[in-house]
Amino acid sequence: MIDTKNLDSHTPMMQQYLKLKAQHPDILLFYRMGDFYELFYDDAKRASQLMDISLTKRGASAGQPIPMAGVPYHAVENYLAKLVALGESVAICEQIGDPATTKGPVERRVVRIVTPGTLSDEALLNERQDNLLAALWQAPQGFGYATLDITSGRFLVSEPADREAMAAELQRTNPAELLYPETLQDMKLIEHRRGQRRRPLWEFELDTARQQLTLQFGTRDLNGFGIERAQLALRAAGCLLQYAKDTQRTSLPHIRAVTLELQQDGIVMDAATRRNLELTQNLSGGGENTLADVLDRTVTPMGSRMLKRWLHMPTRDITTLTYRQQSIRALQDHVAELQPLLRQVGDLERVLARLALRSARPRDLARMRYAFTQLPAIQALLCGQSEPYLPQLLDRVGEFETLRDLLARAIIEAPPVLVRDGGVIAPGYHAELDEWRGLAAGATDYLDRLELREREKTGLETLKVGFNAVHGYFIQLSRGQSHLVPIHYVRRQTLKNAERYIIPELKEYEDKVLTSKSKALALEKALYDELFDLLLPHLAALQQSATALAELDVLSNLAERAETLRYVCPTIDARQGIHISGGRHPVVEHVLSEPFIANPLTLSDARRMLIITGPNMGGKSTYMRQTALIVLLAYIGSFVPADEATIGPIDRIFTRVGAADDLASGRSTFMVEMTETANILHNATHQSLVLMDEIGRGTSTYDGLSLAWASAESLAGRIKAMTLFATHYFELTTLPEKMEGVVNVHLDAVEHGDTIAFMHSVQEGAASKSYGLSVAALAGVPREVIKRARQKLRELETLSTGAAAGSVDGSQLSLLQPEEQPVAPAVEALENLDPDSLSPRQALEWLYRLKKML
């Protein structure tokens, strides 16, 4: 336990530590002491466990031993990366004063706070993934949500209307750190989220938020950003911005605007849909065999991040989509020359963020210079394009000749990692720096001349002049000649076989050289900071250029993918419907060793629902998912895996595909399935694309069939959504006879004895059978079990012929168990009767008795 009440009982150094720690009680404090960052007390115990480092003790303070752990300053980034990956935050406390001139403890100050959502150091970040800080506010009328990518300055807000929409946003953005008010009611919404930070209520106050935002953007109000009335979003944005400023301990000039995201601007997908379509993460949590895995061949990290944002937020803006399609077509002839140039641009977006935070390192500026050298070649390659959008992009890319020349003059070709050791500023950039460096560099020549002169004066041929970091410059002689030294030689150090001396002239030169080195280093650091001041006025244009270059990377990547994977340009139509010829699943096609069987699809006003039947493993789920992925690709502006595609207006994509128990929330497979189904039935519209796969299979046959039937009726009749409805309930294949706009299709299969061949080909009409037993045999179910199953199947088919269709036909079905009918007396008597124990006379008597009971 730390005694913080009586600070006087502690040593001066520990008093300083405890005061700083009191300002950051909930996070680890890295306290700089010489070449180490030290942690004390509970921080030391926690850090030793988290980072697997030794826990020691540092004497005592206030009569108590002090637990201590430490990490070397030169390896601190590795330890920070480990802590951040574990969701920890760290306050970095540096020595500000000079130990040589300070009496008592050297002055220290927390210079930055490293948190999972506010990282900018490349060593701590996944370069091909956004790293977002988010804030959430809940009110009776909905939610406010804000996200900030501090590595780009991208600041977005939205107002999800309900819990499902908020959950979808959290799943889409996947923030590294999430701020929430201490009064948040729905804690279940965020309970499994990483990097949770509970914040006081006052940080979400509306007036404070407005003040924070107008101050940041230098405006009188927020009308120009379209968020003045978005009060829920404003609360979240205000808290987020305050937190970012507190952690960075500097201004944030690269955050220059906030954008309100509106639901109607993009295709809405809920959390289940994003998960089931495996856009950037597969169902196992990895990145392999996802849509992004197939599509992402971008050559810059910032391009890769932009592509993933497009995949998670397809746009409905027809102008934007047309521009992208035209650009992809135009770039197909230039991909081979353009991509190597873009690769050399690198991650300009994050370099600029570090510039804005004044944490850019020498190699960041060298990368920026190298990026600028590629711009003229990019401009020359793409100039003169006839399509309208590429010239706009090139205009935003710019060339920055002045800045390129500045960095070429200022920074050496291959600078060191850090500026603190010097050797960053190029010779010729600053005359005074060159002069101080010349003094330090001329030491070798001077020492050679001095050594030669002293040898001649003394006649001692073994005399040498040298230098070491501890004792400075010296004249060295062997022990055997030490009695011959002149009287003005002053002994500095005695070694086993030699003596070292200093003379006034050498001492004077030593002082001069050491002074020149320290002055050169101080001047170099000042010149390096001055470079920031020269670059920062161009930050807005540089950010615009980085965004344009990232988009150019995405478009050229999509051009390469279209060419390599034989994708075609879809038509985005204002008329309702989806028409696809030769459609293919982009991921399955990519991983298959044999040719993929392409299939058509037509949905229109007269054909709004497809009832899809066919065998397990026949390709029903693949067919449904490929439709959703083709639509999604069309709405990011990409070409699509098909021979031809025309896509009408789409507002939402829903999937009810597969399910598993949600043990963490205590929900069964069937409950998960029904929750997702309810969400679809409440929120789908006539412009929605709905995929329903095997609904109702998690309960009894008749319950499941009834639910599937009623759901299909609602989607086709009331909602009129464009629906692909896969089922094994063959009773549903009678729906087209009862409802307009419903059509049967099936996936073909051919049986050969006990084996089955899946044709993966979509045909009109219903499937003739399910082939479930053939699939079971393929899976290795024992032969005797399959044989018995075939016998039982024949019995069941005989018993239930025609029964199921009648049981589900009707305008409305109750989801509740019907009231149980009382058993008739005659039936009860018959059940209790043993006919084998009756004589012929008794049997006749029982027959008359039963007749009376009816």
UniProtKB/Swiss-Prot annotation:
Keywords: ATP-binding, DNA damage, DNA repair, DNA-binding, Nucleotide-binding. GO terms for biological process: mismatch repair. GO terms for cellular component: cytosol. It comes from the Bacteria. One of its GO terms (molecular function) is mismatched DNA binding. ATP binds at residues 614-621. The keyword Lyase does not apply. Pfam families: MutS_I, MutS_II, MutS_III, MutS_IV, MutS_V. This protein is involved in the repair of mismatches in DNA. It is possible that it carries out the mismatch recognition step. This protein has a weak ATPase activity. Belongs to the DNA mismatch repair MutS family. This is DNA mismatch repair protein MutS. The gene is mutS.
